Amino acid sequence: KYTSINWFVESGVAWFALAMFFMYIITFYTKRFKPVYGFVLSVVIAMILGYTGENTDIFCWMRIVNFYPFFYLGYVISIEDITKWLENKKIKVMAIISLITYFVICYVGIDKIFWLRFLLTGRSGYYRLEYGMAYGPLIRLGVYVISFFIVFMFLSIMPKRRFILSKIGQRSLSVYVFHYVFIYVYMASSLYKYLPYKYPNKWWLFIVAIGIVVTFICGTKWPDALCKWIMNSNIKYRKNAKQ
């Protein structure tokens, strides 16, 4: 077997770093606009460019376009403002009900809504909709609305007090980056075939257990320190850009 390298296409961890690089550059030039205009413009552009039929993996440009509204909103809104708005008890109750409803719908109707998954990966255009391409922008907008709503609902029920998982929550970047190593090892071994074959009804329990262990390993001090060292220049850039 031969291994080929494409210098312009990245589907692993590096795409995230590349996307962050371009997002910081874009934000440097858009910070002069009013936040509401910048946010609306980023959403509209993502809705329109979904019609493209070009290679969407080159420089990860499609994922940059689709995920930039989340990045931009996190850039312009302070955590203090979000916390103040989400402290309302009615919102917390609505969040619990909404999240339970969301998970029930996903669990019960996953076969009917799984076709929308490509919109969440950010890599594909509306051509995946086949006969529904005309409604692509509206579907994309709906996905944005639901995604932002779910994010804010999660934030509203997050406890203020720290507990055992709080430290790992602060190190989510290192978990994201280094868990790929364990995925590659898992796929290279025969476990992904052996477990479902040997334990057809309980193999998913092993996956959950492995996932928990991997999360704790990747959330330790050393992986986190390495990620912070790599991202330190980006943090300094962000502070300078806001001045």
Model-derived features with residue positions:
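Alpha-helical transmembrane segments and their immediate juxtamembrane cytosolic regions
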Residues: 1-243
